[in-house]
Amino acid sequence: MAIIYHRIPIRADKSKVFEAITTQEGFVQWWTSDCVVKPAVGFINEFRIGTEAHYRMKVILLQPGRAVEWKCLNQHDDWSGTQVSFVVTEKGEYTYLDMKQTGLSGENEEYGFINYQWGQYLASLKRFCEAGTKNEVGAAGSGVIAVTAARN
């Protein structure tokens, strides 16, 4: 099984970063406005990106102010059964976000694309947390949808 791992240094308060990865108000700023998100174990978060993607993520771990983990409930793609975790820590003037997606089938063409997508999403999260700039990666014309459409 393959793992995707990103460690992002963010010049923002730890609570702001944690809110951005656990609340609907946070996600609409950096991923997609078409989402339903709740920071509660057992809740199924839903994220839609145009007509190309619909992700269903069950919250399986929530450590307030520190970590959240999801299990992907999608039935039809390489994300099915994978787990995504976000861990937030502080060191000096930075808050670090460690993001992992585990359980991917392997390092193939799809793996490279998923890794690219996460890089785009997390860069958007960093911009939002540091500058307060809304940069919805899942918005029309964001590049991710164009890349997804180009793959079909």
Feature-to-residue mapping (PLM):
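Hydrophobic-ligand binding "helix-grip"
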Residues: 36, 46, 51-105
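Hydrophobic ligand-binding cavity/cleft-lining segments
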Residues: 1-36, 151-152
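Alpha-helical scaffold segments that form or flank carboxylate-/histidine-based iron centers
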Residues: 13, 46-47, 113
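Residues at helix-coil transition
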Residues: 22-23, 64, 123, 130
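Hydrophobic pocket/interface hotspot
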Residues: 17-18, 27, 45, 59, ...
